[in-house]
From Swiss-Prot:
Protein name from the UniProt record: 2-dehydro-3-deoxygluconokinase
GO molecular function: 2-dehydro-3-deoxygluconokinase activity; ATP binding
Annotated active site: 262 (proton acceptor)
Residues bound to substrate: 30-34, 88, 102-104, 170, 262
EC number of this enzyme: 2.7.1.45
Family annotation (Gene3D superfamilies): 3.40.1190.20
Organism per entry: Pseudoalteromonas atlantica (strain T6c / ATCC BAA-1087)
Keywords attached to this entry: ATP-binding, Carbohydrate metabolism, Kinase, Nucleotide-binding, Transferase
Length: 318
């Protein structure tokens, strides 16, 4: 019996941050990539792939090695001859909120659709049980390539893949709200699982409540709608019908919120791929996000996360 397959689409970048000793350090991160790492950590039997563009620079070589260390295949890391990987610097304020500076314009990942066409590789891809992308996956592309990505995902869905999408709205990536809404709607149209935050919908569409988000999403063929509502908790809907509400549990401390949503998405999707109920999947995903915000950086140290996962498993069994 084959392992379930999970492919995430997007951009992994070099992450620069300053240590407590005022020294510069680097790692690798990106929203859908982070989610994929946490999915693999939660459900080790997953075969995980990351579809993106990389360069021929030294950071690209180190980056794909980083993927492999985390159990992520680099089989679909498509190499550009003249573009390198993107870079971002992160600074956290006293509340753990993050502030970014980016150097990603025309990075290799922004050329993804051209790289797919040039390599003529799509026809050789295996079946993917789950395809995951985000508003950022779309936002880095030209409009022509956004359309090509939506068409690619439509083809994968037609072959039996389930599609998951997180809006992850970043205003600076879009010409204006109308531009972002156009592509949000295109993404919702092809998605089976949607993981919006209330802030996404409020900022883009003016939705002031979870019920407004649910009513809006009823025009799409969304099977699972998981609305992250901050301190109000998480609300789950199955084919438009209310399923459950998981209350918000604050973390003991909040050091870095960089990957809270990414870890939530990864663990939730991994649980669902392991046939766990939506409510339990949300509980585990929320707990994982609560752990991640207590540590610096997008990817929590493996031993810390594994110990947390084991404690949670023991508690669940008990």
């Amino acid at each position: 019996m084959r392992n379930p397959t999970f492919i995430a689409i997007g951009e992994c970048m070099v992450e620069l941050s300053v240590t407590a000793q005022n020294k510069l350090q680097h790692s690798y991160a990106g929203d859908t990539y982070n989610s994929l790492v946490y999915a693999k950590r939660w459900h080790n039997e997953l075969d995980c792939y990351f579809l993106s563009g990389i360069g021929q620079d030294s950071f690209s070589t180190l980056m794909t090695a980083h993927w492999q260390q985390h159990g992520i295949s680099d089989e679909f890391a498509l190499t550009s001859d003249d573009h390198n990987v993107g870079i971002y610097a992160i600074k956290n304020d006293d509340s753990g909120e993050r502030h970014f500076d980016y150097w990603r314009k025309e990075s290799a990942a922004t050329q993804l659709m051209s790289l797919i066409e040039q390599s003529d590789c799509e026809s050789h891809w295996p079946h993917f049980d789950l395809v995951y992308f985000s508003g950022i996956s779309l936002g880095i592309l030209s409009d022509e390539d956004k359309d090509k990505l939506i068409n690619l995902i439509t083809r994968l869905k037609a072959k039996g893949s389930k599609v998951a999408f997180d809006p992850n709205y970043r205003p600076k990536m879009w010409a204006n709200k109308a531009h972002a809404i156009r592509w949000l709607e295109a993404a919702y149209t092809v998605s089976d699982i949607v993981l919006p935050g209330t802030e996404d919908h409020h900022d883009l569409l003016g939705h002031a409540s979870v019920s407004e988000i649910v009513n809006y999403c009823k025009q799409y063929d969304v099977q699972e709608l998981v609305v992250k509502a901050g301190k109000e908790g998480v609300f789950a809907f199955d084919c438009g019908q209310a399923l459950c509400h998981v209350p918000f549990t604050p973390a003991d401390r909040q050091l870095d919120t960089t990957a809270a949503g990414d870890s939530f998405a990864g663990v939730y999707l991994a649980c669902r791929m392991a046939d766990k109920p939506m409510k339990l999947s949300i509980e585990h995903a929320s707990a994982a996000a609560g752990l991640v915000v207590q540590h610096q950086g997008a990817i929590v140290e493996h031993t810390i996360f594994d110990a947390f996962r084991q404690r949670l498993a023991n508690h669940t069994v008990a």
